[in-house]
Regions:
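Conserved class I S-adenosyl-L-methionine
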Residues: 133-162
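Short alpha-helix
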Residues: 162-185
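C-terminal lobe and adjacent flexible extensions of AdoMet/dcAdoMet transferase-like proteins
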Residues: 205-278
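A short glycine-rich, Lys/Arg-flanked "PGG" loop and its adjoining helix->strand segment in the class I
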Residues: 118-133
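Conserved catalytic loop of SAM-dependent methyltransferase domains
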Residues: 182-207, 216-217
């Protein structure tokens, strides 16, 4: 029997539950559409340092980014031998990056499964540089998937039906309190939350119409926000320079063929995380 809340799980268990769901048909649909949304936004944004928090290791939404510095932060799970960008294992509310050092930060459903979503958003604001952009992906409660979640039982799969579906307006309010100005939002995945193609085919025309007009009833949304603070002081180190010291301390894992898979092990006592090889 599935537990009634994903928030009772540890970080490793959360990551494995997410990875299992993404490997299925429904999860694959979400991953494909969210990568399409991320690609669309990343093409319009410029930045040297792009970080993703959440998602499945080896399948980052930032794979199409041309930024010279990219990291994918996950909570654990099975790390691939080959990845589009270096992978860091860390907590989503304790990111191993300096303050004001990241140009673009992508949160893939981090708030939906975190025990402390407000702390995750606060940490995202900390590492973003003034003028940096946040791309936040979340499950939409005002969708057919949100209705399906309301009808869920303890026998249903853990994700996404026992995760947190947060209203986009609530996230926007949180962002404003943290000097993150919402700029735009996009929606995707208008099909019914069923893996069987026969059932989905009955509503195909309506699905295409909603997708074409981008009605705000898609299963997922992508919120883009800009960090509003004072501009950089002349002579202040660039984000790339600030992350250079981090990159030097990270050691490639043994047996890597192309891109290194790296681990960051946070200290339990609340001190800054140690950077060690996998």
């Amino acid at each position: 029997m599935a537990v009634q809340s994903v928030f009772r799980l540890g970080l490793q268990e959360k990551q494995r539950a997410w990875d299992r769901w993404i490997a299925g048909r429904l999860g694959h649909r979400i991953q494909v559409e969210e990568r399409r949304l991320a690609r669309r936004e990343l093409r319009r944004l410029f930045g040297q340092v792009v970080i993703q928090v959440g998602g499945t290791a080896g399948f980052p939404l930032i794979a199409d980014s041309l930024a010279p510095v990219r990291f994918h932060v996950v909570f654990g799970g099975d790390l691939p031998k080959v990845s589009h960008c270096p992978i860091i294992v860390a907590e989503d509310n304790l990111l191993p990056f300096p303050t004001d050092s990241v140009d673009i930060l992508v949160l893939q459903h981090s708030l939906d499964i975190s025990t402390h979503p407000h702390q995750v958003l606060r940490e995202a604001e900390r590492v973003l540089r003034p003028g940096g952009r946040l791309l936040l992906f979340g499950f939409n409660p005002t969708s057919s998937w949100g209705l399906r979640r309301l009808l869920s039982t303890p026998l249903d799969s853990l994700l996404p039906w026992h995760a947190r579906f947060m209203r986009r307006s609530q996230i926007e309010d949180w962002c404003r309190l943290l000097n993150l100005a919402p700029e735009l939002s996009r929606h995707a995945v208008y099909g019914l939350p069923f893996a069987k193609k026969g059932i989905r085919r009955l509503f195909k025309s309506l699905e295409h119409r909603m997708a074409r007009n981008e009605w705000p009833v898609g299963a997922v949304y992508c919120l883009r926000a800009k960090k509003e603070r004072n501009a950089y002081i002349p002579g202040k180190p660039s984000p790339l320079g600030r992350l250079a010291s981090v990159g030097k301390t990270l050691k490639p894992a043994v047996g890597m063929r192309r891109k290194p898979v790296l681990r960051v092990v946070p200290k339990r006592d609340g001190a800054p995380p140690d950077l060690t090889g996998a």
